[in-house]
Amino acid sequence: MASYPYGQGYHGAAGQPPGAPQTNYYGGQQYGGGVQPAASYGRPAPGAPYGSPPSGGVYGHPVPGSAAPGAPGGPYGGQAPGGPYSVPGSTPYGSQQHGSYGQGAPAGNIPPGVDPEAFSWFQTVDTDHSGYISLKELKQALVNTNWSSFNDETCTMMMNMFDKSNSGRIDMFGFSALWRFIQQWRNLFQQYDRDRSGSINQGELHQALCQMGYQLSPQFVQIVMSRYAQRSAQPGLQLDRFIQICTQLQSMTEAFREKDTGQIGTAKLSYEDFITMTTTRLL
């Protein structure tokens, strides 16, 4: 499994399709920045949210101290009161704990390039005080709107993307990059959850992918929902699955673009090329 230090080495970085957040996460380097793909499977729709969320965020909660309007809001779970994104109680990620969230640490103790809120959360999530975040600690820290923990696949995917040292742990700089990555996805998730149910249904997912620029059929979206949505009377995707689907779709689209030399939406490749492509691009 490949490692993507702070998201810099992620395969989509050479030219991502619409869908993933484009934000400078660490050291001025852009996660997934680059040229746009051809119109056949990736040109952003007019007015699409690709690149940055709307000014002030969906619920008007920009990050305190953020440099510009439109930055993602606070940790997932700290949304506007009253709706499906309200916080029902305390949680490792999404509410105040031990006075950490919102208070931060003395400015002089925050390393350059580290988000102050991410720094504060790092102190809380690093339960063993090792100076690193393990997969277990990360999973314990992240929750969805329905109070479920992030699934193992999404947590492992994000660890692989932001683990600089291939040690299975994330340092403070990697965590700051990961924190911003999640906030951007959270903002998009809220934007596409048009009925404010706290989850993404099949119609919302199809609309989201279309507005991100992906030309995919309703049948494909149905397959995705049957694979990843919760089993219930009203199947829906929580934030963790939404991040997983969109990030993997971005990676696979970039792999296809490398074979689609004419940028026409079709490519010819051998069976081994196909297997290699799918194996190496799964995060």
UniProtKB/Swiss-Prot annotation:
Binding positions (Ca(2+) 1):
126, 128, 130, 132, 137
- Give the membrane topology, semicolon-separated if more than one: Peripheral membrane protein
The name of this protein is: Peflin
Q: Which InterPro entries match?
A: EF-hand-dom_pair, EF_Hand_1_Ca_BS, EF_hand_dom, Peflin/Sorcin_CaBP
Give this protein's Gene Ontology molecular function annotations. calcium ion binding; calcium-dependent protein binding; ubiquitin-like ligase-substrate adaptor activity
Q: Where are the sequence repeats?
A: 21-30, 36-44, 45-54, 55-62, 71-79, 80-87, 88-95, 96-104
Query: What CDD domains does the record point to?
Result: EFh_PEF_peflin (cd16184)
Q: What SMART domains does UniProt report for this protein, alphabetically?
A: EFh
Spell out the residue ranges making up region: 8 X 9 AA approximate tandem repeat of [AP]-P-G-G-P-Y-G-G-P-P. 21-104
Which segments show compositional bias classed as Low complexity? 37-70, 93-104
Q: How does it assemble?
A: Heterodimer; heterodimerizes (via the EF-hand 5) with pdcd6.
